């Protein structure tokens, strides 16, 4: 391991409005012989979460105007298409979006690079399942053997990207209601802290009746709650962190162009014709 320290005079700070990037060329010599070289693109910015105040970027308070963005590209499929990703991000930028949550998997490097360039803050998410199954063929079958390896690879791969402002260790994992769930959360969060002490860690929690009382939410650096916005105040007052993150607050489940009239209050607005009303 080689450690270097250097000074950048009058740096241009990275932000969604000014996504300034730098390039570091690293060359290692043994005598006059080059043994290795590497090019790292990076940005300069500060970030912190202040108890009782919220998230700060470059010393200024900031709210996330974000989306939970799944890795597929609609009819184009899940294979990486840089042009399609750029087009998608440009449309999000036009509508005022400045943050991306990689729902609910580790992102392609191309997406993170584009977020660096276009100016999106990222919550990079690792897992949709831990050691307790959501489905029979899920990641729980590999968790014990691969969880730490996968987390280490994710953090090391993206820790130099300025767009990444937070790590997420999971989404709506059934383990959150297990009596030992907080230990698994602490295990994964500790890996993030060990590999990258500069960023905070969250998890998308959707079982507040469990996590507010079993120690799970109390473990997290940042308390991420999916939906249940009516419980934000209770969670904020109950937990010691002094912060709440709306990690997932709305779902665009509807059939395009379908509007059922008269409008009725209906869970997910599902009807017998298998359509979902956009109202």
Q: Each predicted region: which residue ranges?
A:
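Substrate-binding/catalytic cleft of secreted carbohydrate-active enzymes
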Residues: 89-92, 98-279
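Secreted/periplasmic carbohydrate-active enzymes, especially glycoside hydrolases
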Residues: 1-122, 150-160, 165-166, 183-185, ...
